[in-house]
Amino acid sequence: MRYAAFLDRDGVINVDHGYVSSPEAFEFLPGAPEALGQLQAAGYLICIVSNQSGIGRGLYTETDLFALNQYIADCLMDMVGVRVAAFYHCPHHPTEARGAFLKQCECRKPSPGMILRAIREHNIDPARSILVGDKASDIDAGRAAGVGRLFRVTNEGGVAISGEGVECVAGLRDVPSCL
């Protein structure tokens, strides 16, 4: 079985400007591409798992998100030779979405659905994998999926509540040195 780095996107890989949905609004956090390169070199599959309720709220479309994902994948390949194994997203919200997107689902973090799907699709051993997130919902999803190591990003002085088995780091760039 393989192992993976499950990564939230906004606030972990890129600056969270709020509902980032286009290449023009996307800005890598310092050291994030290089850290992804180090994780890949250490054998981790790179899997991005991101709540994207902006789709359900009507702020942007899944087509917009797919274009942004391609942009991110292309940038990472060009910058540091990283191949993103998969992008997973949840477009739903339980109270603030429209139409079919308005629902309680199993994919929206803190539910582990996106991670469990990645585990199935890529034959991943969760116990040998890591999760990096900036919110409690990320950590809870990783824990529920049985991910072996959980990292909470504080983003330079932000408040990070660490629970049992959670390692706090200033940014994604610090994770490879913890492994």
Q: Where are the regions a protein language model picked out?
A:
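Asp-based, Mg2+/Mn2+-dependent phosphohydrolase catalytic module
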Residues: Y3, T63, A67-A86, T95-L131, ...
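Active-site flanking residues adjacent to catalytic metal/cofactor-binding acidic residues
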Residues: L7-R9, S50, V132-D134
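Short, flexible segments with low predicted structural confidence
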Residues: D10-G11, H89-P91, M114
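Substrate-recognition element of Asp-dependent hydrolases with the DxDx(T/V) motif
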Residues: A32, L36-N69, R83-H93, G142
